[in-house]
Amino acid sequence: MPPFAHRAGLVTEAERSQTRDALSEGGAFEARPWGGFRTLEEGSGYKVKRLVVEPGHRLSLQRHRFRAEHWVVIAGSPRVIVGGRARRLKPKATVTVPRGAWHRIENPGKVPVVIIEVQHGPYLGEDDIIRRQDDYGRTSERTERG
């Protein structure tokens, strides 16, 4: 597929499906309203995930008390917000999200965004999320461990 195809509206549903199929390797896929993720590996103090953000969707504006994250864009062109700074990224771009920083991943494009996320910290549970804003009604004053 030419690199401009998604911007020109030339991406077919079959091509989108092939992209999702190519990403289906690894552990169990955990669906979320925005797409979902697979945990690829985890150990003491770290976890590696493959995130897929579907076109037109975005994650919560959120932060974590116990972990920092490092993102590598694999596919798509996400808009990310970290610490109040928004920017558009391309494949191979990297982002560091410090512990406690408000952050979000958005997919304004026509193809799925794929990001490899490396989490590190003393606690990596899915309940270490404090949401400020969420498109899917999951906003809460305080959803955190401890």
Regions found by a protein language model. Give the residues of each.
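Double-stranded beta-helix
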Residues: 2-31, 104, 108-146
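A short glycine-rich, His/Asp/Glu-containing loop-to-beta-strand
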Residues: 25-68
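Short beta-strand segments
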Residues: 59, 85-87, 128
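Short, charged beta-turn/beta-strand-edge "cap" motif at the junction between a beta-strand
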Residues: 65, 101-104
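Glycine- and acidic-residue-biased ligand/ion/polar-headgroup-sensing regions
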Residues: 66-79, 83-84
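Short acidic-glycine-tyrosine-enriched beta hairpin
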Residues: 84-102
